[in-house]
Amino acid sequence: MDFAKGHGTHNDFVIIDDPNGQRDLTAQQVRALCDRTGGIGADGVLRVVRTEHMTAEVEQAAESHANWFMDYRNADGSIAEMCGNGTRVFAHWLHRQGYEAASRFSIATRAGDKAITVADTDDAGRAPDSQQAVVSVEMGVAEVTGLSTAQVGSENFAGLAVDVGNPHLAVVVPGWGAEEIANLHLTAPRLDDEFFPAGANLEIATPLVAGTTHMRVFERGVGETKSCGTGTVATACAALAEAGLGEGTVQVVVPGGTVEVEIRSNGATLTGPSRIVARGTFSVELPA
């Protein structure tokens, strides 16, 4: 199996080209690919499929006007509705491979179509075959669905439940700064099962200071990762709300880098880096 590897602020993905939709990845196969000791190693898998080959399987694909569908799987093999960093890497790959020649296009996801803008960059400036890019994704409306709580170890946290195409609990801890976030022992959270029957991603973040918040994330189906794109959108929304603001632009600092999130009443935009780091052939026989 040929593959590529990419990351967005060190949230990393295995990329599988399957334009005609001929490869049916099982959960066990995804787990094998994402295994960091026995496989390639990643936080998830991005299967690149022409949208027309997903219409019978995914309702959103049948309604899409985009050429390509992002079939995203978490490292545990589960299907996820949306992945913000994965969307940036997916879009970068489409543009780099020439599947989408224009710098502005849309891709189909299980959370609907997402408008994309890709700017190729390298150390010498713009280059059409660049390994890195800055990608903006129109994420749709970040919808606050209520208040909920999480227990992490012996600590209890309260935060905003935010739907960004997938569920999040974004916690802004008053009085915390970057040091407290870095020192947090972030383990698998206990969430309110009635509020989040399918689970959720948990973000722990600092209040806004000069338009910046620091964040860590525990992703549903993966564990702690160095970044989560949809999580940065949820966190920006919660940090603005904690500051008494409904809209604004926030720099979100995660262990893997920094992204910019613009929150508006009619939508949110996530902008950040993408890098393609490897291409190869996976020669180990995958489980059924």
PLM region descriptions:
Residues 1-131, 170-288:
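A glycine-rich beta-to-alpha transition motif near the start of alpha/beta enzyme domains, typified by
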